[in-house]
Design a protein with these regions (language model features):
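Polytopic alpha-helical membrane proteins, predominantly small-molecule transporters/carriers
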Residues: 1-423
Length: 423
């Protein structure tokens, strides 16, 4: 199995691929309303897949979670709460795109999410200034974060250039509700709440430690955390989707193969229920694997686990942009616009390399220190062995001296007896 920082970067790329790809199967879902297929996929994203994978790959899942709630209820409650807040971030992301447009909305929301998810844990722990002053690898990771933000900004410019080149009717539809002030405020909310996933993962670290105590391999110890955090995310999404289904009268679509045709009001249409369910399940399971690989990658990042969030966000934007090219979403755009997109993807890719290099620097710098520690331990052990040998030798010498004194005394007594007999 891949080990070290390079393995961690690869796992985060795989997580980004899963996140950037999960929506593709939803395109095969026909006639279901958004809230119906989103919740159908959500059951697999937030309930079924997390518990199945954690149950298969970890030891004593239920006892671990029970022990976690008993030993550290605050950590588990925070994990669930942050999961709920993360769910709000995902739902408000749609409003961000509505008021700022696809390109500017994604650039602002994802940029805020990247910065907050990466830095706030260290800001909260009050270690960021100390780390900047004393740890060069930490500064390299912050440089990687800056490069990632630059890539997000360039991607935003590419998106705005694409929107300017759209046909007049499409452009009007895309910006008809544009509201910069409202959009920026919602983007701040969305970016912060979306970053709560990173906070939840960190808050539930005690559960990962308990999983390790139960014999779970270090690569899988983060999976039980996801069961709790994603349950919080499911709660938020379930309540919102249920509200929409009651409002739009679409709840019935879950249990029938004949529904009202959304394209022709007043008409009914038959749907392939199993096909819709299959592709929703495929999309939901694919979505889950972003955090499955995230939890694996985090275990390989060493002391700087916080950098996992930067790698995760950069990888998502890279692969979602590539899918946009594959699905011809950039068809008709100018060479300049496509060049901007290419530069954005390249910049984001470079940011993952910079962040990975910073972690690698820390890993390499830790090896000599570990070697010195081992030598010190070995030296101490050797000194202790010598000391024990000297003590043993002294004890043996004392025994010999005692025996010699006893023999000398016995000889004196024997000589006295012989002399007495001779007289």
């Amino acid at each position: 199995m891949l080990s070290g920082v390079l393995g961690g970067v690869l796992f985060h790329w795989l997580g980004g691929l899963a996140s950037g790809s999960f929506y593709v199967p939803y395109k095969a879902v026909k006639k279901w309303s958004w809230e119906v297929y989103w919740l159908a996929g959500g059951f697999f994203s937030w309930i079924i897949a997390p518990w199945i994978m954690a149950g298969l790959l970890t030891n004593d899942l239920i006892p671990v979670l029970r022990e976690g709630f008993s030993a550290n209820p605050k950590a588990c409650c925070l994990g669930y709460l942050f999961g709920m807040l993360w769910g709000i971030g995902g739902l408000t992301f749609g409003l961000t795109l509505r008021y700022l447009g696809m390109s500017l909305g994604m650039a602002v929301a994802l940029g805020i999410c990247t910065v907050m998810g990466t830095l706030i844990p260290d800001v909260y722990a009050r270690t960021i200034i100390e780390n900047i002053q004393s740890q060069p690898p930490y500064c390299v990771i912050l440089l990687g974060l800056g490069v990632c933000l630059l890539g997000v900004i360039i991607a935003g410019f590419a998106g705005m250039s694409k929107e300017r080149e759209m046909p007049a009717e499409e452009k009007k539809a895309a910006v008809k509700e544009f509201n910069f002030t409202k959009g920026i405020l919602i983007a701040l909310v969305s970016g912060f709440f979306s970053a709560c996933m990173a906070f939840g993962i960190q808050a539930m670290e005690p559960v990962a430690e308990i999983a390790a105590e139960h014999g779970t391999g270090d690569l899988w110890v983060g999976l039980p955390k996801l069961c709790v955090i994603l349950l919080g995310g499911f709660t938020t999404n379930f309540l919102w989707c249920l509200y929409l289904m009651l409002k739009n009268k679409t709840l019935y679509q879950f249990g029938t193969t004949t529904i009202q045709d959304p394209d022709q009001p007043g008409q009914t249409v038959k749907i392939n229920y199993l096909s819709n369910l299959f592709f929703s399940a495929l999309a939901g399971t694919t979505w889950y694997f972003q955090f499955f690989f995230y939890s694996m990658g985090e275990t390989r990042m060493g002391e700087y686990k916080f950098s996992s969030w930067t790698l995760h966000m950069a990888s998502i934007i890279i692969f979602s942009s590539l899918w946009g090219l594959v699905l011809h979403e950039w068809k008709g755009s100018s060479r300049f616009t496509k060049a901007l997109l290419g530069i954005a993807i390249g910049t984001l890719l470079y940011s993952t390399i910079v962040v990975g290099y910073g972690n690698l620097m820390k890993e390499i710098s830790a090896e000599p220190a570990a070697a010195v520690a081992v030598e010190a331990v070995e030296g101490e052990a050797a000194a202790q062995a010598v000391s024990e040998a000297v003590n043993q030798a002294n004890a043996t010498l004392d025994d010999l001296l005692e025996e010699g004194a006893a023999i000398e005394q016995q000889l004196e007594e024997t000589v006295e007896e012989v002399l007495e007999e001779a007289n």
